[in-house]
Amino acid sequence: MVRFSCEKALVQQAVAAVSRAVAAKSSIPALEGILLECGEGLRLSGYNMQTGIRTTVEAAVSEAGHIVLNARLFGEMIRRLPDDMVTFEADDKFNVKLNCGDASFERPGLSADDYPELPEVDDQFSVTLEQRTLKAMINQTSFAVSVNEARPIHTGALFEISDKGLTMVAVDGFRLALRREPLEHIDGGAFKFVAPGAALNEVEKICADTDDMVTVTQGKRHLMFEAGATQLICRRLEGEFLDYKNAIPTTNPICIEVDNKTMIESLDRVSVVISEKLKSPVRCLFSQDRVYMSARTGNGEARDICPVRGDGQELEIGFNNRYLMDALRYAPADTVKMQLNTGISPCIITPVDDSDNFLYMVLPVRLKAQ
């Protein structure tokens, strides 16, 4: 038997959080469900054998126990209940009754015996920072995480914790994104690991845009991100991550300042003629205080002039329009510095104040002679 009562809003929020880690399809039916454990409170878990999310909510438990419910149907039932106190009852045969106001649902559940335990994360190292900071860092780097399984290590983001703070790096072979923030709470000294990109997308969602803290724990094989009453556990990615420090060129004699919004608008205009079927690089001619942009495909030709500050020394270089726009869009600044060398050298985007809290690198695309 399981019996508890809880506010609908709390259950709905918890179900939404853990459902993101539930397997869509599995040979183990329990993995398509949410594990509910009743003891001193109510704990809900979702696990797809790669990533697990569990959270605890306040509930009045009259009979302790555990049961598994299909995540999709349970979520739909809870969502449709009126905003009131929900009463949950399950008998010895795992038949479930949900009551809330005048509404009720009945549904068979599953035994929790077949539900695999989430991995235990042995605390080797940990670091604590504000949730809004980690949320922003993931958002501003995860777009550059590789989706190419040929290099599994690059399907995640590198976390480096040192006296410089927390550095996050993502790379996909065409671009690199780096964010750095100072830290106050480090337990265990310097350490580093690679977290899967898919798991980080979920970490971004469980982190609130507040100064509440999140703790990141590195274990031998797994990682845990703990924000309030919610924990996300995932595997560490193993392998040799790119030596990003040596991959970033340091000789960049051309340096111009760019207003992000203005350049994104110019790129967006010339990108109108570019499509998935008709791809073409954006041709950029960096001149004195302006960049001449153009693109030509079977859809037509587009041109624009973007004002900048600095001498581009008549450098002509091509870029993938989306990669350059992403770097400008996710850079946490209104104005950035673009550093260039030759038409076949990467473009480096950094803060105008020479701080090291972000860096984006975009590789060029070879241009055909016109």
Predicted stretch roles:
Residues 1-370:
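Structural preference for solvent-exposed beta-strand-turn elements
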